[in-house]
Amino acid sequence: MGKPVDDLLNSLMNLLDSETPSGGGCHLCDGLLSRELGKMLRKALSELEGVELSSVKSGVSLPAILIEREDRIRANHNPPKMRSLKVTLTRLLDVAISSLTGLKVSQEPDAILIFDFERGDVKLELAPVFIFGRYRKLQRGISQSRRKCPECGGRGCEACGWKGKIPQGSVEGIVGEVMREFFSAEDYVLHGAGREDVDARMLGEGRPFVMELLSPKRRSADLREVESEINRRAAGLIEVKNLEFSRREKIRILKERSPNVKKLYRALVEVEGGVEEGELELLKGLEGAVIRQRTPKRVLWRRADITRLKRVYEVNFRRIDDKKFELFVLCDGGLYVKELISGDDGRTSPSVTEILGKKSFCSELDVLEVMVE
């Protein structure tokens, strides 16, 4: 790349010189560009080595003194056709990088090259890759998000690879680690359409999610192969399906729709003092009911203490023995079903406990369907 860079550099400098008044070079930058531009172009090409891209954009950071000098020239002389040095330089660098690499210039690029002329450095910022899909959680005890590293409390240490989080035991970590390898990404973030409790399974067609892969050096992969590898490594724990490339906009759509989706739950309910088949028929009174639910005590540490109104659409049940029955509930997303059963000491009403007149609690919970349009 030595000679192509030199040839292009000469062309760029000639172009800049052609816009400089004759007799002594550039009074604006004092020769900064001629001294630094070649070195920084080579650094940019070095940053791009081994990175899979189809588009790029340049960004420029100039020393404050150059900006001040440019402002004084404008104020004192008001040149009619004077273009901003930053804008001009950005356009020239876009052309240069595109010519040297064959990458197209885009306003929504795969990467941005930041040319810092104050420090004489170039930084490559890689746009995330977004992958949409659904996950099924087949075992209890798996969280959706990674947990803080117990060694450092989230600050980052050698034990957690300086991430502050541990991948083991979470959907985000199990799925994200495989995707990170395929895309040579630095890190990842899972964005889900809501979340289930750690001790709940996510069954049926699965929960929609978007995985955001940060600073990926690869941008393409066979997603069927990615899917297969995730399911192989996580056999019996989780499954993913229907993986497809997506965009950041999908995250916003998931988050906006999540509180409004309907969800179907299966709960194993235990009743103090036992329950008869006829008593269970009373639970049909929940169908169509609007539930007044104050934030459950168990999540007050992370949720505002407010009252939410959620609707139950359908209720079915199956008696197992004198003290247990299965409860199937179709309801609004965001309804805490464990508290719909227990009543949470009156914070949720009506509840199974209230209707039966007997203390009831949920010993198992499964999400059977997340009905996202």
From Swiss-Prot:
Its EC number is 5.4.99.25. GO terms for biological process: tRNA pseudouridine synthesis. InterPro entries: PsdUridine_synth_cat_dom_sf (IPR020103), Pus10 (IPR005912), Pus10-like (IPR039894), Pus10-like_C (IPR048741). PANTHER family: TRNA PSEUDOURIDINE SYNTHASE PUS10 (PTHR21568:SF0). It is an enzyme of class 5 (isomerase). The keyword RNA-binding applies. It catalyses: uridine(54) in tRNA = pseudouridine(54) in tRNA; uridine(55) in tRNA = pseudouridine(55) in tRNA. Keywords: Isomerase, RNA-binding, tRNA processing. Belongs to the pseudouridine synthase Pus10 family. Responsible for synthesis of pseudouridine from uracil-54 and uracil-55 in the psi GC loop of transfer RNAs. GO terms for molecular function: pseudouridine synthase activity; tRNA binding; tRNA pseudouridine(55) synthase activity. This is tRNA pseudouridine synthase Pus10. The keyword tRNA processing applies. It comes from Korarchaeum cryptofilum (strain OPF8). The active site is at residue 197. Substrate binds at residues 265, 336. Gene3D superfamilies: 3.30.70.2510, 3.30.70.3190.
